[in-house]
A protein has these predicted regions:
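Active-site acid/base region of carbohydrate-active enzymes
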Residues: 55-74, 131-144, 181-244, 272-279, ...
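Glycine-rich, acidic and aromatic/proline-enriched surface loops and short helix-turn segments
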Residues: 74-85, 121, 130-137, 174, ...
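Low-complexity, Ser/Thr/Pro/Gly-enriched N-terminal "stalk/linker" regions
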Residues: 19, 39-103, 126, 283, ...
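N-terminal secretory signal peptides
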Residues: 1-9, 16-23, 34-36
Length: 520
């Protein structure tokens, strides 16, 4: 138990106690007190005000790797150039084809993490709020796929409430992104009535409106045209009944909604949607697995049959997004999917035609490789996105996801599902001796992180209250050290199957802590 000072209120003590229980529960998932401690900590922290908004564009990156430094400088400058305040919608950033003066559901969802690192979190919230506010029964519980700077549906996509363009994964994608933004920002606005209504309608009424055979999956029927497309691969709108990216996004939304309801102490709803998520994962890893070809099917076609890859050379719906959303089963099936994705990356890099399937699909690759510990492929995919010769490099999603991949992938920074707890997990390759990311906004804190290879990490709590730092390293090590002393460490497998050694370190405001692995 931590000592109580004169400045420490009873509420602070309760929060610290709950935080300790939660962190212990995270390291020992079997603890029966895990759910209780997490709910208690969320309730105690829900009313805490944030200590000011993040400063836009404050983030800085330094490294021994010149390629990464130059790529970061370009991506930061390019991304901030898309941050705008014109129009009537308030602060926003372009997240669509340049020149459309608009932002699209899929793009914002994928760009939101990079935007957070850039200090643009309040803009993301404003944009997400517009999507949430415009969900309606008249549109079969869709919202506006693309919104202009004047808070109107983009005319290229929308005629009226009965004739508009819509990709069915989008509702789920936005819900998942809102949950992740809530973790990053701890902004209680993401739990206001407008957002909660959107979340609830998405996982209930939206599913019922588009699930025509009542099997729990949404379908695109032949007469739908551009309404209710069952995949993000829009070239296949008339060929796919259910895309694997659709079921993957639905799974992610159910997981996000489960966490949101658990945080609100709505445990019955949390249990219901956790069960629904588990059912989708079981269904996908059973019926959607093609044992003969050792890969997942990409879609159910309009003919009612499973298909591996309906579009030669792309196949984005086949494997990328199920991996991205964590739908694939840990072990051989996930490894098979990653192997296919690595082959596609190499084909992409060697193709005289440039990016096969577009930069949109390519922009997910660094996320995925780093997520599953394939740092070598992650580095190749990330630096390819930075390449000045990349076709359509000016597409907004490219620069934003480069920033996000540097932060969450290479640097391994992420907020954990309980407040004031941050994780780092370095994934540097031999090209990068050291790397540092400064002025990163996370919740009520601003932090800096530096990795020396994958053996030493320092974290500075630049501003904000004391925090718990989960310092994790790839591999299994004999011990971890801090301040010249061995510290308690846990060796385990991450949820994605990568071996790790980790420890929890408390970092006060203005303090820098260093953790390193034992040599030898």
């Amino acid at each position: 138990m931590m000592a109580v000072t004169n400045e420490c209120s009873r509420r602070d003590v309760l929060k610290a106690t709950a935080a300790s229980l939660v962190v212990a529960g995270y390291l020992c998932k079997g603890s029966s007190g895990w759910g209780y401690a997490q709910s208690a900590f969320h309730r105690l922290t829900a009313q805490d005000a944030r200590e000011g908004e993040p400063q836009e564009g404050a983030i800085e990156f330094a490294s021994s790797d010149v390629k990464l430094v130059e790529g970061f400088r370009w991506a930061k400058s390019q991304a901030l150039a898309y941050a705008r305040t014109d129009g009537t919608i308030g602060p926003w950033y372009e997240a669509s084809l340049p020149g459309r003066d608009a932002f699209c559901m899929r793009d914002v969802s994928h760009m939101s993490t990079g935007a957070q690192f850039l200090g643009l979190g309040p803009r993301t919230k404003n944009m997400m709020h517009r999507f949430a506010a415009n969900i309606s029964a008249a549109k079969k519980w869709c919202t506006w796929w693309e919104i202009t700077r004047d808070n109107l549906p983009a005319p290229v996509d929308y005629n009226n409430d009965h004739d508009f363009w819509y990709d069915l994964p989008a509702n789920f994608d936005v819900l998942d992104a809102c949950y992740r933004q809530w973790l990053w920002t701890r902004d209680s606005d993401y739990l206001d009535q407008v957002f909660l209504n959107y979340y609830r309608h998405t996982v209930t009424d939206y599913v019922q409106a588009w699930d025509h055979d009542h099997d729990g999956l949404l379908e695109h029927l032949p007469n739908f045209g551009h309404m209710g497309i069952a995949t993000y691969d829009e070239d296949l709108q008339d060929e796919i009944l259910v895309g694997s990216d659709l079921i993957a996004a639905q799974y992610a939304a159910y997981r996000g909604y489960t966490a949101i309801e658990r945080a609100r102490n709505e445990l019955k709803a949390a249990a219901e949607f956790e069960q629904k998520a588990d059912h989708l994962k079981s269904l996908y890893n059973g019926k959607w697995w093609d044992a003969a070809r050792n890969c997942y099917f990409g879609a159910i076609g309009e003919d009612g049959k499973f298909h591996a890859d309906l579009k030669e050379g792309d196949g984005r719906c086949a494997v990328e997004l199920p991996l991205y959303y964590g739908l694939t089963a840990a072990g051989p099936k996930t490894h098979a999917g990653l192997d296919i994705l690595e082959q596609r990356l190499q084909s992409d890099l060697n193709s005289p035609r440039g990016v096969i399937g577009g930069v949109e699909g390519r922009s997910y690759m660094p996320d995925i490789f780093y997520m599953y510990g394939r740092s070598r492929a992650g580095y190749s995919a990330l630096t390819a996105m930075m390449d000045p010769g990349l076709q359509r490099r000016e597409y907004p999603e490219v620069s934003y996801t480069v920033i996000g991949n540097l932060g969450t992938g290479l640097m391994g920074i992420r907020p954990l599902p309980f407040e004031q707890t941050i994780e780092t997990f370095p994934q540097l390759t031999e090209e990068t001796g050291w790397a540092a990311l400064h002025h990163v906004p996370v919740g009520r804190n601003v932090i800096s992180v530096k990795h020396v290879k994958n053996n030493e990490t320092s974290l500075t709590n630049e501003n904000g209250p004391g925090l718990a730092w989960r310092a994790a390293f790839p591999g299994k090590f004999r011990a971890l050290f801090s301040r010249g002393k061995e510290i308690p460490a846990t060796r385990a497998l991450r949820s994605t199957g990568t071996a790790e050694t980790c420890s929890i370190v408390h970092v006060e405001r203005g303090e820098t802590r260093v953790v390193r692995v034992a040599s030898g």
